[in-house]
Amino acid sequence: MTSILQHRILGSVLPDELPANVENNLPHIVLLHGWGLNSGVFDQVAPLLAETMRVQLIDLPGFGYNAAIPLTELEETVAQLASVIPDNAIILGWSLGGLLAQQLALSHPQKVLKLITVASTPHFMAVADTEENAKESAWLGIAPKVLLQFETQLARDYQKTVQRFLAIQAMGSVSAKHDMQALKQAIEAYPAPCEASLLQGLKLLQQVDLRAQIGMIQQPTLRVYGRLDSLVPQRAVAAIQVLQPHANSVVMEHVSHAPFISNKVEFCDIIMRFVDA
């Protein structure tokens, strides 16, 4: 039996919980977090978005209040998310959450009215341009050795490994110290993640490759990037755009991998303009 994911709502309640005589026209936006964290990472922006939208925050399996539910393969995880998301929602996925959001748009299109990815990509791991690898297959992303190091280090000290990953996420941002502190607070305020799910999350970052599929995404799409992001480098933006030409792309200045923490006002403005369009 599949466990139901815990989630919380800001701004209103789910449509089927509304009294029959109450009309509900608020856009419904779902926020999906990244590896090693939990929905608390959105605590600074969720109240701002909730002023004009109904905001649903979900801890991914293996993280936060869903730490007891194992993170598994991509398709099963997306099906778990779909079971607690209403139809015609706006799905916003950050980092690993962006991978899940893209797959959700592909395999459960009725759930996704609009798609937003933040500091995300269809394939996180870099692919080198070598003799064995055709030049057109080369891809900018996280060096394979970095992800393998995290995988090895998890078995020794998972807390230190997560902290190191957070530092990389904040690296380069003009507000790196503030960003790092906010990310740490989000972790500490929630139950610790499951170590097995941390490992599985890294495997998803290593193995999931949606490059051949994202061109089939039919929903209006917004891709938000940080110019200083080292995990999803700015130079990768053009390659992603080629694969999904109809997507809108915004590169935020002076921010790294967590733009909604570095500049929450500008970030929310970008999101709300897309939602209202």
Regions found by a protein language model. Name each.
Residues I217, R223-Y225, D229:
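Short beta-strand/loop motif that positions the catalytic acidic residue
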Residues E75-A89:
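Conserved acidic catalytic loop of the alpha/beta-hydrolase fold
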Residues R8-A68, L74:
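Conserved HGGG/HGGXW glycine-rich cap/lid loop of the alpha/beta-hydrolase fold
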